[in-house]
Amino acid sequence: MLAGVDKFVGTDLEKILKEKGAKTVIVVGTAAHGAVLYTASAAAMRGMKVIVPVDGVSADTTYIEQYVAWHLVNVPVIGPAFTLTTIDQITF
């Protein structure tokens, strides 16, 4: 998808997820402090549950990865929407 850091902005992502009846999303990526943080937060603000496998995200430094994980689960209001896990723990 061609978009900024929030993949809901300027795309049909929200429409597609609604059409599919998705209530939970799994967010992964190589920019923990960019698209992962903003897209995960945007999904939570839209009432979705968000799963973030910590071994499915990366950043320039380990500190950034750890901060983003901490921030997601500790942010006021939407923090409870997030579940941190690992890729091998995700099942469908």
Walk through the language-model features, giving the residues of each.
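Active-site-adjacent betaalpha module
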Residues: 1-92
